[in-house]
Amino acid sequence: MAQAGGAGAGAWGRRGAGAGAGPERAPWRWAPALLWLAAATAAAAAAGDPSRRQWPVPYKRFSFRPEPDPYCQAKYTFCPTGSPIPVMKDDDVIEVFRLQAPVWEFKYGDLLGHLKIMHDAIGFRSTLTEKNYTMEWYELFQLGNCTFPHLRPEMNAPFWCNQGAACFFEGIDDNHWKENGTLVLVATISGGMFNKMAKWVKQDNETGIYYETWTVQASPKKEAEKWFESYDCSKFVLRTYEKLAELGADFKKIETNYTRIFLYSGEPTYLGNETSVFGPTGNKTLALAIKKFYYPFKPHLSTKEFLLSLLQIFDAVVIHREFYLFYNFEYWFLPMKSPFIKITYEEIPLPNRKNRTLSGL
């Protein structure tokens, strides 16, 4: 299994519309496809390795970020105008902004905003220099590649182009965030706190390397057992807020909501990693079942093929109640349950200050 890479601290930058043609999973089809599946499933009315029964399964962190595989190409260039995070003067006063706008707003405007499918970021403004900055975390090779693999004829195992990384650049695009989303002040911090946050962001970015679309739990109830947590743009924002609160930031009392995509299943079954499933001594029947499940999610050449694949996905997930999840570079089987999949826009409050000695302000 190859994993795309190349988003270390020196590669941070602003997303853009530059394009390199490649095997990118077309978002203009799979975004409405997810919505269709969510609507359709809402209308439709095991034993693994005991040592792995820690729920939710902890997100695995790594000691380094691997280099990108040339096969993995993004339609929209990752972070093309990025810059290193600047060192602020300790006595500077930094305003912190909550930024939120519809996913793919640059292409579809407010279309996905009406469905509350939002992208999250953080803005900063230095009082001393009057410079603005944007910081966000997102997929290197677009959402489809982070969610589903490529089935390459020359490879036995599915091939994943899944990485996410931090992006930092000077400036805040007011129109982008205000027109169809949110740009609001949530906290004020010192330059010293900002510098400590920057060191934490670098470490977080170097060790948390892959994107996870799904939150998987037993039911829609708030107290339901959670099997897997997502790891996406909103989780990066929430982690950063928590770090700032730990450093002493005092957040305003305002409502903050975030998009989440849920899968609902019974207790997952651990299947193994790439070698144990797809290697020479692997389970060929299981390997074939996993590849058969992922086959309908491949890039499509025609509308007819795309619609046929939607029916195959519905049959697998809803009728046969099966889903194969790739998490921490390991495969899991999810025995799906009604309502199967749901997209929500939930409130997650801003954190309370952890440290009452706010030095430098």
Swiss-Prot record:
InterPro entries xref list: CLN5 (IPR026138)
S-S pairs: C72-C161, C79-C167
Intervals, Lumenal compartment: 49-361
Reactions performed catalytically: S-hexadecanoyl-L-cysteinyl-[protein] + H2O = L-cysteinyl-[protein] + hexadecanoate + H(+)
Quaternary state and interactors: Multimer. Interacts with SORT1, RAB5A and RAB7A. Interacts with PPT1, TPP1, CLN3, CLN6, CLN8, ATP5F1A and ATP5F1B.
Active site: H119 (proton acceptor), C233 (nucleophile)
UniProt topological domain (Cytoplasmic) ranges: 1-30
Tagged with keyword Membrane: yes
Protein name as catalogued: Bis(monoacylglycero)phosphate synthase CLN5
Site (Cleavage): A45, A46
Disulfide bond keyword on record: yes
Disease tied to this entry: Defects in CLN5 are the cause of neuronal ceroid lipofuscinosis (NCL). NCL is characterized by brain atrophy and the accumulation of lysosome derived fluorescent storage bodies in neurons and most other cells. NCL is found in New Zealand Borderdale sheep.
Assigned keywords, A-Z: Disulfide bond, Glycoprotein, Hydrolase, Lysosome, Membrane, Neurodegeneration, Neuronal ceroid lipofuscinosis, Signal-anchor, Transferase, Transmembrane, Transmembrane helix
Sequence ranges of Gly residues compositional bias: 1-21
PTM summary: N-glycosylated with both high mannose and complex type sugars. Glycosylation is important for proper folding and trafficking to the lysosomes.
Molecular functions (GO terms): D-mannose binding; hydrolase activity, acting on glycosyl bonds; transferase activity
Residues annotated as transmembrane: 31-48
Chain spans, region Disordered: 1-24
